[in-house]
Design a protein with these regions (language model features):
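Single conserved hydrophobic/aromatic residue that forms the stacking wall/gate
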Residues: 1-8, 12
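Flexible, compositionally biased loop and terminal segments
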Residues: 3, 41, 46-48
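Thiamine diphosphate
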Residues: 36-44, 57, 106-113, 171-172, ...
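Conserved thiamine diphosphate
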Residues: 48, 55-59, 65-220, 226-228, ...
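N-terminal glycine-rich anion-binding loops that anchor highly charged ligand groups
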Residues: 13-40
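CheY-like receiver
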Residues: 14, 63, 154-158, 258-259, ...
């Protein structure tokens, strides 16, 4: 078994078979990253392939863009997802558009890794989940892993993809799954998705994972909230499908529609604020495709429409109780 940190090191090592793959960002070289996800990689692969950058997210992204359109496959790290916004112009206006702008002559195989979400008492600027700010941008692919196993498979697919990929990593899950209890810090040692093969394997971008199978409600989530939903379903006593979306763009429409058509009920759970969150896009898409099969309104359990708080973090993040309440409401109709 291994942690997400160890998995990340294995994945980059595995992808290093392609000498065009390089990794850089703030503190990722000598120090091994603020969460130690690149620990030992510089020593193994050399300073020319794993190196530190200045504290400039815009500069990191711009450098990766130039490298990408000239034949390299950069894997960059934005130290926290909250810090990605100085790089927004380079990601949205350059990386995402170069294939279309050049008529397919150029492409930009850049993977942008960034720790996201709450659960570490990071306050306003170390806790956000800004995935919906990128799912709205044509030309980008957006991934949000949840376990060591899918983190490796998805990251290899992202690195080998010819388009830019935003790869969100739930920082609360680096050392173990998060079931919603801030006082309990489990490790990955006993989780079935913690076993990470040493061999090269990929999980296709756009494929969801059916984590739990049931027949009375469909619960959809991604990142750390997948484990919160797992706990909620267990405690609710309601038979539910739990879908770990894994990739938000493109998302697995077929798997979701098949499940909601079967259960007739749906709960979508994410950490980001409710208004204009990706759950709203999913709810609209599900309603368009499953209207005649829905037995109750689609429920969303999300963060609140406020900046991420520090002292009341556990009231902000969706917990099992809120998810259970939503599941029960779907059964009352």
């Amino acid at each position: 078994h291994c942690s997400v940190r160890r998995q990340r090191q294995m994945c980059i090592r595995d992808s290093s078979r392609d000498k065009d793959v390089i990794m850089f960002g703030e503190d990722v070289g000598y120090f091994g990253g603020v969460f130690r996800t690149s620990d030992g990689l510089q020593e193994r692969h050399g300073k020319h392939r794993v190196f530190d950058s200045p504290l400039s997210e815009g500069g990191i992204a711009a450098t990766a863009f130039g490298m990408g359109i000239n034949g390299l496959r950069p894997v960059i790290e934005i130290q926290f997802a909250d810090y990605i916004f100085p790089a927004y112009d380079q990601i949205v206006n350059e990386m995402a558009k170069i294939r279309h702008r050049s008529g397919g002559e150029f492409w930009c195989p850049v993977t942008i890794r960034t720790p996201a979400g709450g659960g570490i008492r990071g306050g306003h600027h170390h806790s956000q989940s800004p995935e919906s700010q990128f799912t709205h941008t044509p030309g980008l692919k957006v991934v949000y892993c949840s376990t060591p196993y899918n983190a490796k498979g998805l990251l290899i697919s992202a690195i080998e993809d010819n388009d830019p990929v935003i790869f969100f990593e739930p920082k609360r899950c680096y050392r173990g799954p998060f079931y919603g209890d801030p006082h309990n810090v489990p490790t990955w040692s006993d989780h079935p998705e913690a076993e990470v093969p040493e061999s090269h394997y990929k999980i296709p971008l756009g494929d969801a994972r059916l984590a739990i199978e049931g027949d009375s409600c469909t619960v959809i989530s991604w990142g750390a909230m997948v484990h919160v939903c797992e706990q909620a379903i267990k405690d609710s006593g309601v038979s539910c499908d739990l879908i770990d979306l894994q990739t938000l763009v493109p998302w697995d429409v077929e798997t979701v529609v098949k499940s909601v058509t079967k259960t007739g009920r749906c709960v979508i759970v994410h950490e980001a604020p409710k208004t204009s969150g990706f759950g709203a896009e999913m709810a609209a898409s599900i309603q368009e495709r499953c209207f005649w099969n829905l037995e109750s309104p689609i429920e969303r359990v999300t963060g609140w429409d406020t900046p991420f708080p520090h002292t009341t973090e556990w009231d902000y993040m969706p917990g099992p109780d809120r998810v259970i309440e939503a599941i029960v409401r779907t059964q009352e109709n």
